[in-house]
């Protein structure tokens, strides 16, 4: 991370496994490139809401507990009206929110998509990291942030469905999703899915 200022970056997927690292968060938030923010970086933002202003147009991928801390609402409040709350938060902060769940909500405050692809096998630690990596790779290919978030959620979910069909939701791991994304993309591009 010492060289962040010295390199041209297309995108950064950030926050997974960084722990409590305020200096690194602020350094990454200043880098001029597309960003997807997840996990520990979302927890940092929940305690440092002024830093949201540095992330205009970025993608945030909270699960309901992370989003409750970020939005200052209880998980129950979030789950009772997730679409409207995610839309308002995205609009107020000029961000793309991917509220992860069985049906993920992807919104920029103006447009909202509900992603129903996926399976219960994704409810494991590390699956969100895979999603962030997929979205980050799409951002690096210059796909606009909202479209990258929508496509990334679909690709991750569809890949998980395919992996679960070949093994089971009980035995699948996030690495199985990550290593199968290429086959899913190939099938999508050939209109087989």
Task: List each language-model region with its residue ranges.
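Short, small-residue alpha-helix embedded
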Residues: 68-69, 124-155
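Glycine-rich phosphate/dinucleotide-binding loop and adjoining beta-alpha-beta core of small-molecule
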Residues: 1-117, 186-190
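Short, well-structured alpha-helical segments that form the helix of a local strand-helix-strand
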Residues: 82-91, 145-158, 174-182
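Charged C-terminal helix
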Residues: 160-193
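Gly/Ser/Thr-rich beta-alpha loop segments that engage phosphate groups in nucleotides
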Residues: 17-21, 103, 120, 127-131, ...
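Alpha-helical transmembrane segments in multi-pass membrane proteins
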Residues: 11, 15-17, 124, 132, ...
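Short beta-alpha connecting loops at secondary-structure transitions
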Residues: 71, 116-122, 132, 162-169
